[in-house]
């Protein structure tokens, strides 16, 4: 997984440079469709990196880097969905560097496996709701 995290970190850093370059030029036409077309597969891979360890080992992965990466994934997903309805130009200058840094944290602090089985639905619902509330 560290190779995938490094690749995603480079994609998010590249998107940050892409947005910064277009913001610096102050161009009237911004290639939003290009940005969202690059962001969609990156979000899909990022989501898979977050969910596959949980599904494979059937235990909850908790750690600083994992939690921060999950929260940033939620924020980027909200940005991606919101970009279809609202003009959110400029928000990416904060989100993409945060996403790259969160993936660095996830690689450095991968977390540990907690003994809570994911079959314990009330607890999983509680943890999921708390992460969603914090991330959104």
Regions found by a protein language model. Give the residues of each.
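Hydrophobic transmembrane alpha-helical segments in integral membrane proteins
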Residues: 1-13, 132-134
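Membrane-embedded alpha-helical segments in integral membrane proteins
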Residues: 13-23, 44-55, 128-129
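Membrane-interface helix-loop junction between the first two transmembrane segments
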Residues: 17-37
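Transmembrane helix-loop junctions in multipass membrane proteins, especially transporters and channels
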Residues: 23-28, 54-58, 87-88, 111-115
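Cytoplasmic-side transmembrane-helix entry/capping segments in multi-pass membrane proteins
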Residues: 30-39, 65-66, 89-100
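A generic, lipid-embedded transmembrane alpha helix
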Residues: 38-54, 102-108
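Membrane-interface helix-loop-helix modules in multi-pass inner-membrane proteins
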Residues: 45-94
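Hydrophobic alpha-helical segments and helix pairs
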Residues: 85-134
């Amino acid at each position: 997984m560290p190779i995938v995290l490094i690749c995603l970190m480079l994609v998010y850093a590249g998107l940050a440079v892409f947005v910064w370059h277009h913001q610096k030029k102050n161009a009237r036409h911004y290639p939003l469709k290009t940005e969202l077309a690059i962001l969609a597969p990156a979000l899909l891979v990022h989501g898979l990196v977050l969910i596959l360890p949980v599904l494979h080992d059937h235990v909850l992965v908790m750690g600083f880097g994992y939690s921060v990466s999950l929260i940033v994934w939620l924020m980027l997903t909200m940005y991606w969905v919101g970009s279809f309805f609202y003009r959110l130009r400029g928000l990416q200058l904060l989100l993409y560097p945060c996403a790259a840094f969160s993936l660095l944290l996830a690689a450095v602090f991968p977390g540990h496996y907690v003994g809570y089985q994911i079959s314990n639905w009330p607890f999983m619902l509680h943890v999921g709701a708390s992460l969603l509330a914090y991330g959104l």
